Amino acid sequence: MDKYSRKWFDSIVEQVIERLPQLVREAMEQVPLYVEDYPPRKLLRQMGIRDRRQLWGLFTGVPVNAKHFDSLTVNLPDRVTIYREGLMWSAMRPDGYVDEKLLKKQIRVTILHEYGHYYGMTEEELEQYGYG
């Protein structure tokens, strides 16, 4: 398998998921994890991000602690998306090769960060736990 192919990256993501805390894996049953190569341009413009490699993940939806069961509003389904290109770039060594150990760490931190948002954690709280 080509080391930098999408198939290779997906296998790394699967390895990381297997080692995630049970609470997060249970959340994944309710809030699916998607892997995309890079974020859409429209999203980057909305977020004020110029380099698409700077966005590694995104939670979209309503955090658990903000859901109201008596609300009549319709929301898009909750989801977490991680972006392959940015994560690969974040683990790139000076010689141009991807550090697989660092890549696994970055994927783990990104997934935990985004599911932290699902549980209602702020950026500051995530930073305190090392998932900033």
Locate predicted features:
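Catalytic glutamate of the conserved HExxH
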Residues: T110, E114-Y118
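Short hydrophobic/aromatic patches at helix-to-coil boundaries
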Residues: Q128-G132
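Active-site rim/adjacent substrate-binding subdomains
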Residues: M1-Q106, Y118, E124-E127
